[in-house]
């Protein structure tokens, strides 16, 4: 079964063709990072306009690279939640139109849940691909640490669509904290890669930042860590809280910037690993997967390898950040259990918890 996946929830326009929830035939991504880096973050209106320009060419290219016509496509899967409303509308409108035009079943996909399913792709038919895939699909029960710019969650999957949300961020997601700290210390957007690069040259023990203590041992909080970095930067350059934060980077030298990056990254990743290790000890899953853009962080991978008594096989870097391969992959599993959506009435949902999409429950139809 070949699924055309379409993703446009934030600032990547993507389309992919995935077969049987595991084999990647094409994966096309148009990123807007260069556009939004001028603003220090994603501008929703700019993102939506860029999606409008890219969506049709991206879908066409994905089909061409997969050597597929519409007769070869069995269904369409598209991100409908969560995300920026304007961005979501572009992708879903394209998917709805194509589903009607070509008479294809349409499956609405939850973006955060889909990140987990990037780990289910085990191969590709693209001859020139340099991607390295996991040797096998994860086994259930599966513990998933989902870490991205908008989400930080620990989820225990019992089976496809059957999962429990163990914990989540109570304020900033870890990827959001990376972006904000990068801005504080004068590193470019996006903050994840910038901080990781600077941290290699810094001392992770130079500044000791706190870890949040929460009632739920699996929940996350990064707003306090972000504030602690801000206060430490102010102290390091001899300024108090009244000094404009946007002027702080000019007062830092490169060594200070690297040390702040390394110290922040150390504690942020330690926090993630602490929660993952506790959940592993408590639930003893058969496999562990890391999903989302922050999964590409090499220090996070290193800490997990040192502290978890189980090997983790990672999705390729290109499938950690936003992509449509994960949408098409999850779409296949949706198609096994769920009725397709009505393309005439499907609406986007900018804010939607994974707990509202427990699709293993047959009474819940999207």
Annotate each predicted stretch with a short phrase:
Residues 2-72, 78-82, 115:
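N-terminal beta-alpha supersecondary unit
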Residues 109-142, 330:
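Conserved phosphate-binding catalytic cores of ATP/NTP-utilizing and phosphoryl-transfer enzymes
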Residues 13-19, 144-146, 152-156:
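Short beta-strand scaffold segments in enzyme catalytic cores
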Residues 108-109, 288, 304-327:
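Conserved phosphate-binding/catalytic loops in two-lobed NTP-binding clefts
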Residues 78-81, 98, 148, 289-297:
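Glycine-rich beta-strand-to-loop/alpha-helix junction loops that act as flexible
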